[in-house]
C-alpha cells in the first residue's frame, strides 16, 4: 500500500484496482479507511481523498462480519461519516495510481453531476509541470 500526500489531497493506493478490477472479488479488495483514519487526515487539512479500491470504507464483506458480531451500526460507512464533522470529498475506483510519483503534480477533478444523486463519477487528471 502506498500513501501520497500533495498539499490538501491524499491518495491511497491499495493495489485493489490493478490486481482485482474486473474480477468478482474487487468489492472485497482494499484496506478501507475508518472514521478515525479519515478524521486524522481531515484534521491535517486534507480536503480531497482518493483510492483505487471500490470504496473509501472497509469492504462490505468485512464490515458485514464485524456487524454480525457486534451489531454496531457506526461501522457502516464510517469513513464517509467523518465528513459530517469536517467536510471533504473523496474519489473511489481511481485508475493508474501506481503510475503516479509521490509528489510533483497537481490533481484536477472534473465531476459529472447526476440530477437527484449524492454522488457521480469524475475525470481525475494529474497535471505535471515541465
Show which residues each predicted segment covers.
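Active-/binding-site microenvironments in catalytic and ligand-binding cores
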Residues: 11-130
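Single conserved hydrophobic/aromatic residue that forms the stacking wall/gate
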Residues: 1-15
